[in-house]
Amino acid sequence: MRYTKWLLVILAALLCVPTLQARRMKLMTYNIHHGEGTDRKYAPERIAKMILAEAPEVVALQEVDSATQRIKGRYVAGDIAQHTGMHATYAGAIPFQGGKYGIALLSKTAPKAVTRIPLPGREEKRMLLVADFGPCVVCCTHLSLTEEDRMNSIPTLRKVLKKYRHKKVFVMGDFNDSPKSAFMNELCRHFQVLSSTITPTFPNDVPTEVIDFVITRRGTNQPRATGMHIAVGSVASDHCPLSVDVEY
């Protein structure tokens, strides 16, 4: 009888211990061709429709215009944010046509802190956009067309993210390189690819190239992908949007 009572006490105590629940999040990366579709129409609502279909928590956008002549002074990230109900964070990489051309993050909640870091780019300057959301850090980038510049981006990326060594880190974007390249081999010494390395994302109609990626920093209890989706065929951009479900 006494044994039974102690057993019940122990079981009750165990039931009262809170369990650590894994966090789940959907991420998307999307090169939006400055907001202009393959039909040469500026239609941010079409891009927003692609985003809303997946309902990601955070979206990394590349080739994002702000106040340029070719889009008649519009702020592309802001227009898409308005259609999706998300918060826009912008990083201009270069001055262009009276405005800026760069990258952006859309998020369901505003980041707690934002950092903009220049990256190597000889044909045009490149940028790393870092958003701290508390439990995790999400970054957006659009890497150089030149392999040497891409290689030289890795030390900068590692140095910047060292600040967040106690947080889970995700980097998304158009890396302008293939999964089996020398650059990706070097990058994967420090980062794990969460997206597919065999499913192409460019061009939009009949994809043949894998150049858009979602990666995470290697380490103990690193995040893992639980699902992925690539939407093919939309004229909203020349790239396909890539979504990855992650657990961390």
Predicted regions and their residues:
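Structural motif corresponding to alpha-helix initiation and N-cap regions
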Residues: K41-E45, G73-R74, E124-K125, M151-I154, ...
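Surface-exposed cleft-lining segments at the edges of enzyme active sites
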Residues: H34-E36, T115-P118, T141-E147
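Bacterial N-terminal signal peptides
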Residues: L8-C16
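N-terminal, active-site-proximal structural segment of metallo-dependent hydrolase catalytic domains
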Residues: R2-W6, P18-H83, P95-G99, G233, ...
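Structured beta-strand-rich core segments of catalytic domains in phosphoester-bond hydrolases
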Residues: R24, D39-R40, V64-C136, N221, ...
